[in-house]
Amino acid sequence: MKAVLFDLDGTLLDTLQDLTDATNHTLRHFGSPEKTAAQMRYIIGSGAYFQLQEALGENLAKVDIQQVYAFYRAYYDVHSTDKTAPYPGVVEAVNALAKKYPVGIVSNKPHAVVAELCARFFPGVYALGEQAQLRPRKPEPDMIRKALEDLGADSCVYVGDTQIDVQTARNVNAPCLCVLWGFRDRDQLEAVGAEHFCETAADLAAAVEKLMKG
């Protein structure tokens, strides 16, 4: 059986402003320059550790990244839905696909945050985030394999918006549908071998269906 697996940030949910706010709250506390949302757009994708390391830049050597991460998590876990919302049309697309196929959401965010966001915006849809007992995270195949096992599927179409997603799909021999409303531009995705694209959420279900039948 084939499933449909989605990335979360930049694919289903517009989390950019909440991630930017949490990062800047953290940067201010540790004496580092803030980032604009435009800058953050190209940092997001590999999880909060990488995000914070990139945002700190040359100041990374001056701080304890574990303390930085703990401070960030304490803020973001409380404010993760302040400005976050689904991209227009994606809820309808996910619900339509869920009537035909096993559907899941797999994110590098901590599992507790993923579960809360998905319960709020995609109730009833399988959700999996990073857990201590389930590493390494994407783009390694472990989380995808776990999701497929839980869904009773043996393969998938994977939907995402970053280079990490393209590599994730490649690592499980799955076709990757790249959405173009997320955190990366088409040329960045093509540079890592992306072949399938979706420009609007109105076309999302049909684009997935095409790959499911391919």
Model-derived features: where do they sit?
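N-terminal helical cap/lid subdomain that shapes the substrate entry/recognition surface
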Residues: 2-91, 99
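Substrate-recognition element of Asp-dependent hydrolases with the DxDx(T/V) motif
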Residues: 23, 90-118
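Substrate-recognition "cap/lid" segment bordering the active-site pocket of phosphatases
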Residues: 82-83, 110-159, 163-172, 186-188
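Glycine-rich phosphate-binding loop signature in dinucleotide/nucleotide-binding domains
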Residues: 98-101, 150-154, 211-212
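Glycine-centered short loops/turns at secondary-structure junctions
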Residues: 100-101, 173, 193
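Short, glycine/polar-rich helix-capping loops at beta-to-alpha or helix-loop-helix junctions
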Residues: 181-191
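Short acidic-hydrophobic, aromatic-tinged amphipathic segments that line or gate anion-handling sites
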Residues: 196-200
